[in-house]
Amino acid sequence: MLFDKSFKKEKIKFDNSEINFLHGGKGEALLLIHGFPQTHTMWHKVAKELAKKYYIVCPDLRGYGDSFKPTGLKDHSNYSKKVMAKDMINVMDYLGLKKFYVAGHDRGARVAHRICLDYEEKILKACFMDIAPTYHMFENTNQAFATGYYHWFFLIQPDYLPEKMIGDDPAYYLKEKLKRWSDKDIAFEEKFDDKAINEYIRCYDEASIHGSCEDYRAAASIDMIDDEKTRNRKLNTPLLVLWGEKGFVNKTYDV
């Protein structure tokens, strides 16, 4: 098992959605939100240790893992970060957790940012990992960004083009993304547990491929509209922001 037996798996339905999540531990609540192309499984190496001090909640975002994977609407609004943030709040409310810490990586950090904007009163402290602001990244697109983050522009293409191309060999695409984003000096097999990789592959079905594409389509459309409204608003939440020393964000942006 990737997670300790003390973690309980649940799936709850609400607001025309269904979110899969694991939870367990003791102490104040800590919501952990994964990125692309992973699922809640990405936290398996740290969850047990964190659970000694915190009550851990690890959901699958909509469109990912074993959560709800709806067909994207024309305006992609059902994959907006506002909607994803509401999903996370619904999970925490279901568990009776009115105030909590939140940490997110990659796409999960963008959802965590939206949670801090829309539900500031619920957040004790936040941690964003490996992101720069979406609006800033699109607004300052250059060759380095377009090359390093080519998937931002590939996954948003319409008419199921990326879905069909990725769907030809999902396992290859998923593993290649993880390889390219991780330390080149460490062998792939040393960085990733085989069970975790197999779980990512199991979840990366046709619906999940579409869901992740819709996540990025929303980022380039409805999320930009929402971010424009709040782009000059500073968070009052105590915040820790982290980047990988060898990662793209640290090398590319003034962070």
Residue ranges and their predicted role:
Residues 22-70, 91:
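Conserved HGGG/HGGXW glycine-rich cap/lid loop of the alpha/beta-hydrolase fold
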Residues 1-10, 19-21, 29, 64-103, ...:
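Flexible "cap/lid" subdomain of the alpha/beta-hydrolase fold that forms the substrate-access gate
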